[in-house]
From Swiss-Prot:
InterPro entries: Actin (IPR004000), Actin/actin-like_CS (IPR020902), Actin_CS (IPR004001), ATPase_NBD (IPR043129). GO terms for molecular function: ATP binding; hydrolase activity. Actins are highly conserved proteins that are involved in various types of cell motility and are ubiquitously expressed in all eukaryotic cells. Keywords: ATP-binding, Cytoplasm, Cytoskeleton, Hydrolase, Nucleotide-binding. PANTHER family: ACTIN. Belongs to the actin family. ACTA and ACTB are actively transcribed in mycelium, sporangia and germinating cysts but only at a low level in the case of ACTB. Its main location: cytoplasm. One of its GO terms (cellular component) is cytoplasm. Its EC number is 3.6.4.-. This is Actin-1. It comes from the Eukaryota.
């Protein structure tokens, strides 16, 4: 389908960040927040060339006067008009390409509603007139990027986490576990527990400040109860953060209480399993012969796995769950924040992948439902 000289575009639309770039590159060209901001107030200065909507970094920088909305929630697109704006911004402003000249690879969370992919396909072909496209599962691409063909991927982003077992390149769909608990829930939880300290964060713009605090200062405790004791007895764990207006706030046990939710979702009232239990459940749903290979190839990917201490804690929790003789290895590649994108870049530049694309002709013949037949 695609000629060898046309570079494919790889777009990893996360709930929190959009990563986009060209196939064959080793890192995404453009990484910007998946947000659309609309002005809260009427513009009164003539000639200011005000827009009705801002996307990505521009929305982030003007966040004080905007209402920020994320069109993707828990990995599912909830607002297609805003999603179209984000894609338009990706192609024309960030990558500066004409989408009608390049095949496009998109990514998706597993166990998503089928209508979500169909709509994605429809917009790509009908609004952006792409010559070809493909949709792949995020975790599968992360495994590509880690150079393995077998492993259990724990992919946790801003909107959704999932564990996917892959054996010799085949994903085992019956064993996928999806957890609607990820970075955004942690940010919301942090907003809540900072209120206990007397710091109130309420607006959509302030939520972004809390996200920044979360990304810079939090870590995962190896032993949560022990860490709580330490924090209560001394102020050694306290760190300060300077807000945009110059005020300095001090945070203590919030630093490790926030990401603890990943292991104990009951802290935010979610009746779900922690990420370690999800990984264990996934492996237990697989054939008994391949479990050993999965236990020693647990690959972390996505921005919510960037917390310091996550690998050690994961190893400890899984060792407690798994049979005592089992060797457990948790792999946390340094580039895991972008490993989905990197995997997409690798996959779409493989010569064997070229016949996998859904072409415009196939779409015209079968309509959006072709995506279920051709994509995993």
């Amino acid at each position: 389908m695609a000629d060898d000289d046309v570079q494919a575009l790889v777009v990893d639309n996360g709930s929190g960040m959009c990563k986009a770039g060209f196939a064959g590159d080793d890192a995404p060209r453009a990484v910007f927040p998946s947000i659309v901001g609309r002005p809260k107030h009427l513009g009164i200065m003539v000639g200011m060339d005000q827009k009705d909507a801002y996307v990505g970094d521009e929305a982030q920088s003007k966040r004080g006067v905007l209402t920020l909305k994320y069109p993707i929630e828990h990995g599912i697109v909830t607002n297609w008009d805003d999603m179209e704006k984000i894609w338009h911004h990706t192609f024309y402003n960030e990558l500066r390409v004409a989408p009608e000249e390049h095949p496009v690879l998109l990514t998706e969370a597993p166990l998503n509603p089928k209508a979500n992919r169909e709509r994605m396909t429809q917009i790509m072909f009908e609004t952006f007139n792409v010559p070809a496209m493909y949709v792949n599962i995020q975790a599968v691409l992360s495994l590509y990027a880690s150079g393995r063909t077998t492993g259990c991927v724990l992919d946790s982003g801003d909107g959704v986490s999932h564990t996917v077992p892959i054996y010799e390149g085949y994903a085992l769909p019956h064993a996928i576990v999806r957890l609607d608990l990820a970075g955004r829930d942690l940010t919301d939880y942090m907003m809540k527990i900072l209120t206990e300290r007397g710091y109130s964060f309420t607006t959509t713009a302030e939520r972004e400040i809390v996200r920044d605090i979360k990304e810079k200062l939090t870590y995962i405790a190896l032993d949560f109860d022990q860490e709580m004791k330490t924090a209560a007895e001394s102020s050694g764990l306290e760190k300060s953060y300077e807000l945009p207006d110059g005020n300095v706030i001090v945070i203590g046990n919030e630093r490790f209480r926030t990401p603890e939710v990943l292991f104990q979702p009951s802290l935010i009232g979610k009746e779900a399993s922690g990420i370690h239990e999800c990984t264990f459940q996934t492996i237990m749903k697989c054939d008994v012969d391949i479990r050993k290979d999965l236990y020693c190839n647990i690959v972390l990917s996505g921005g919510t796995t960037m917390y310091p201490g996550i690998g050690e804690r994961m190893t400890k929790e899984l060792t407690a769950l798994a049979p005592s003789t089992m060797k457990i290895k948790v792999v946390a590649p340094p580039e895991r924040k972008y490993s989905v994108w990197i995997g997409g870049s690798i996959q779409s530049s493989l010569s064997t992948f070229q016949q996998m694309w859904i072409s415009k002709a196939e779409y015209d013949e079968s309509g959006p439902s072709i995506v279920h037949r051709k994509c995993f």
